[in-house]
Amino acid sequence: MLFVEFRFFLFFLVVFAVHWALRGNTARKVWLLACGHFFYACFFIGDPVAFLGQIRDGDWAKMPDGWWFPAVLWASTIMDYVVGRGLGASREERTRKLWLLASLAANLGVLCYFKYFNFFVTSAGAFLDWFGLHTSLSTLKIILPYGVSFYTFQSMSYSIDVYRRRLAPVRSFLDLAFFISFFPQLVAGPIVRAMTFLPQVVEKRTWASVRVRDCCTLFFIGFVKKACVSEFAAQIADAFFAEPSKYDHLSSVLGVLFYAVQIYCDFSGYSDMAIASARLLGYELTPNFDFPYFSRSITEFWRRWHISLSTWLRDYLYIPLGGSHGSKLFTYRNLLLTMLLGGLWHGASWTFVIWGGMHGVALIFHREWQRSTGNAGALFKKTMAVLAVPLTFYWICLTWIFFRAAPLIDEKTGAIKATSLEMAQRIFKAFTLFGAHGSKSFGLDCLAVFAVLALVHWLNSRRIFTAAWQRLPDWAAAALLGVGTELAILFVPVKYKAFIYFQF
């Protein structure tokens, strides 16, 4: 059930109405917990009537793939609730460490099995083959549960914060279960911290705190980003990444640029709609984006892009590794290791590891650059101030090539004609000054569309639209949102692509 689908609006209308009609806070939490698991189930049960019939008849062979996904979610929740209670009752540091280790082992074990088992097996097999030790390692048919990368991180952060004594363990299992399975952020974030969300769960939400106009505006912006802009950009990006060698150099550049547009509008659009939905129910989620493509350095980019993940990696991985407390080499090791693991978190592929490594190297380079140019002249600093944003964006686009690259499959035989790494290499050459030699072209109209999107995005980053919007009376804002929604619907495709981050 995607946020841009009509059935989600019907679902949310029922959730919203019942939530605010209920008087007691406990009743509301039970209701939203049930809604969260219903929302989660909609991703795999298919036809609800047929699914219930299969359960009634015990016809397990015909059950849809992933019907057991909720069991993984419940197991993670129960595990960390027990760990939290154990940490709260323990006084000896050794015992507390054992409790924390149990949480980390369980959550990371689940993540490694479902997401990385086959990756590790195939990588080990390729490594042994490289040394001439031919093996026949077998992979398993493993289905990745939706949202497992997100809710395991949330669940782990709760146990870690309780261990660090930054958070008291929750007494009510309902509170923790609600926190982990709150449907706006369940499948693709933002990754919410227990320290910021659990206090909201304890306190009853009030309608007076809900700014309906702001929520509807934010949801509309997210809807347009995903349903209109991202879906349009995907047509160009998908066409190029499927056959990069057939396009000329300008079209190769446009193909990568439109993927940058696609992934930003897709993911930030989802985050906008998730945050808006939560706010309409009285809850606040972590902001996830702050115009990252206008960053003046890769360091600033990671303060603006996927903020909930970057801060999670900082607080629960980079700092525990030692952070910047130590030698320069020690600090750079921590940076690179954090980004490599951050890349691997996104997917079980070496292209994601390379993507993370490129960001890690760029972060190290930026620190060295700051040290070496600290005493540079005024003219040099002004020149770099002008070039900082385009150079940073160019590097980000280079990294997106490895993030997006997928293996080339023969449609007739199903054989792999080129691996993800080989495709990334071809696209990298086409995008950079090496040039491309194909004849297909997207045309100058696509370049004009990109320029218009960039201009609108820049104006929005300057809060120009926000200031004008806030001056409008409520009736005018409501009318414009209604007209805007009708116009947006005219441009939406018949069938939406799933949000990109659902696969992670």
Sequence positions of predicted segments:
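Membrane-embedded transmembrane alpha-helical bundles that form the catalytic cores
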Residues: M1-Q503
